[in-house]
Amino acid sequence: MENELPVPHTSNRASVTTNTSGTNSSSGCISSSGGGGGSGGRPTAPQISVYSGIPDRQTVQVIQQALHRQPSTAAQYLQQMYAAQQQHLMLQTAALQQQHLSSAQLQSLAAVQQASLVANRQGSTPGSSVSSQAPAQSSSLNLAASPAAAQLINRAQSVNSAAASGLAQQAVLLGNTSSPALTASQAQMYLRAQMLIFTPTATVATVQPELCTGSPARPPTPAQVQNLTLRTQQTPAAAASGPPPTQPVLPSLALKPTPSSSQPLPAPPQGRTMAQGSPAGAKPSGTDNAPETLKAGDGNCNMEGRPGPGRAVPAVATHPLIAPAYAHLQSHQLLPQPPAKHPQPQFVAQQQPQPPRPAPQVQSQPQLASVSPSLALQSSPEDHALPLGSVTQALPLQCSTTHVHKPGNSQQCHLPTLDTGSQNGHPEGGSHPPQRRFQHTSAVILQVQPASPVTPQQCAPDDWKEVVPAEKSVPVARPGPSPHQQAIIPAIPGGLPGPKSPNIQQCPAHETGQGIVHALTDLSSPGMTSGNGNSASSIAGTAPQNGENKPPQAIVKPQILTHVIEGFVIQEGAEPFPVGRSSLLVGNLKKKYAQGFLPEKPPQQDHTTTTDSEMEEPYLQESKEEGTPLKLKCELCGRVDFAYKFKRSKRFCSMACAKRYNVGCTKRVGLFHSDRSKLQKAGTTTHNRRRASKASLPTLTKDTKKQPSGTVPLSVTAALQLAHSQEDSSRCSDNSSYEEPLSPISASSSTSRRRQGQRDLDLPDMHMRDLVGVGHHFLPSEPTKWNVEDVYEFIRSLPGCQEIAEEFRAQEIDGQALLLLKEDHLMSAMNIKLGPALKIYARISMLKDS
């Protein structure tokens, strides 16, 4: 599915009413539900009305309400389509001959080609003009417009199927063009692909004009799908006018249409209104033949009766097929198709209507598109058996050639021929991809089916390649593998190489001889690719890479899982990454070993170069060994815990404690006036110590603070303070070497701290007492009790803050407000510069701590 182009989702429902010259009975509403090949959620139902009064006069009037495409674009499309048709017809003939088709098959192909050419020319020239805002060119195309073309179609079922498939393709083209969502280039791709697929028939020409005429506004998929479905249905009807057995499947197809494909298929009352100008609206009169056949021919009301199954099989098949198929065709098949030009195989498939395997086909397919089974069945009187999936596959056979041309390989999925056999096995899984792939091909399938009852099962990518070599036999033999093959198809994108596998060999078992087979046989060869490659491509709707298109397949890299996690692209390797412990961890362990904490560890250090699991185990062991015997105490909060829970320097139980300790050290750095910092230190150091030990110390320090002159002996107070300051400063210096980022001040001034601690030791007791007394003389010991004047004095005493003190007084900041201040308050509200603000805030923090 990598290669699928996104297709706008629109309702799959298409209402097709076919008015045969004699009867309206076989009008069917084809609605495809989400079940079919991924086309199931389309909101809008494009409507197409095709009026083909009589076989002789088959006219399609398309009135488009709004043509979003520019006329020039439409004209270009038409020109491209015509050129492609001519090339394809020529290529088809050559390819069929190259494929060594049986003489009968070749003859039938020739007849089909002739009929298609006649139909195209007649349709384009005499055919009723298609009214479209698009270039005038588009208006002239009608496949079956002339009686001669109608006669040709009626005359040969294969011819009819070809013409019908052409119509279906036209519908596809219309759908693509009309889809507003599709870009012009995409539309071109669709057109090319369709033309290639259906080029054998004049219908291609008709399709082109339709494209132009089709209203671009319509969502591409729904309209296209509907058109395709209708056309496909029509085509099968015309082609399979003989065989009614398969009718049940195809509600709208009602393939049973009498051989006369000429019967008009006004059908699409639903959205088809010509006035609507829906893409479908552009149905070529030539197409009408197929619809006519559908509806009447046999009068099998398959179309009508089938509506119940919903999604007249053909239509539904087309829908699912078209939506996915278009995407594929766009990227893979459509563009390449013009080069490949393997449409010829189409005819081959058409030529062999003989093998009637109608019944099987219907059953299996219903799930897929519920419709497609019938489609396939009807397409060839004998080959109806193809399920929807098979239809898609069959289409590939006929159209496959077309598809293949696109990349040749990409689509080479050889529709391994949609024989009934395959229907059964993979109606569901297999058919979806094909449907998706070959929306256009659905019509083709009809054509192909006559050629071989061969099951379309060959969806399996493996079969595709093989089928080509097998040539004739390959497509037919598909039935057996079909179930799993189809299942494979969805997976194909991943590994197309599979298609090359022997599955194809199986095909020969069935009707290898038949035309379908030959078409598919030469997947690899350009001409053959159309047949084989197509089927494969349709099968691999998701992965339009045939065995031959392996390159398009998903490129298989060695198993590397790639994850996108929070914007990071993470690729998993086949082998574990060489993981080593973090340098910090390794450094710590080395220190421990050196210190002899863990004597048994050193041997384990060798594990650092070992695998992840080996590396983890020793560390866990270390942690356990450390944990049981080794417990550490936090230097700040006093908490005792296992050593492995202590971070980095193993001195603090948590980062919070480490940071708080660092803050304390920073405050004690000699940042401030020596007098002031010493005064402050007298209080702060005792506070820090008190907090660390939480014991009898608090009461002692409180006493010292409360008594200015010191009821407690001054020597005791001084000794405590000196000891604390010395210990704190040594802690700070120790901290700076182990702890993570200390503040620049604290990290850079461990020496100054040490010096200051030394100085404090030398200070006489009286000097310390004087400092304490001075501090308490100026300010109350509790900052919360300060008034505005106290705060003013405090700020004025800070270095460089004399001028700012007035601002504090003006703002009426008292002690409590002071403790609530933050740096931003100082800078934003009071317009204080950063330097003084930081100093003031540092002092406020110290006050809080005290």
UniProtKB/Swiss-Prot annotation:
PROSITE patterns: SAM_DOMAIN (PS50105), ZF_FCS (PS51024)
Region annotated Interaction with BMI1, chain positions: 33-56
Gene: Phc2
One Gene Ontology MF term: identical protein binding
Protein name, as recorded: Polyhomeotic-like protein 2
Subcellular location: Nucleus
Superkingdom of this protein's organism: Eukaryota
Motif (HD1): 550-579
Single GO BP term: spermatogenesis
SMART domains: SAM
Listed Polar residues bias regions: 368-380, 402-425, 696-712
Keywords: Developmental protein, DNA-binding, Isopeptide bond, Metal-binding, Nucleus, Phosphoprotein, Ubl conjugation, Zinc, Zinc-finger
UniProt-annotated binding residues for Zn(2+): C634, C637, C653, C657
Subunit text: Component of a PRC1-like complex. Interacts with CBX4. Interacts with BMI1, PCGF2, PHC1 and RNF2. Interacts with CHTOP. Interacts with the N-terminal region of the SP1 transcription factor and with MAPKAPK2. Interacts with SAMD7. Interacts with SAMD11.
UniProt keyword Nucleus present: yes
Main subcellular location of this protein, as a coarse class: nucleus
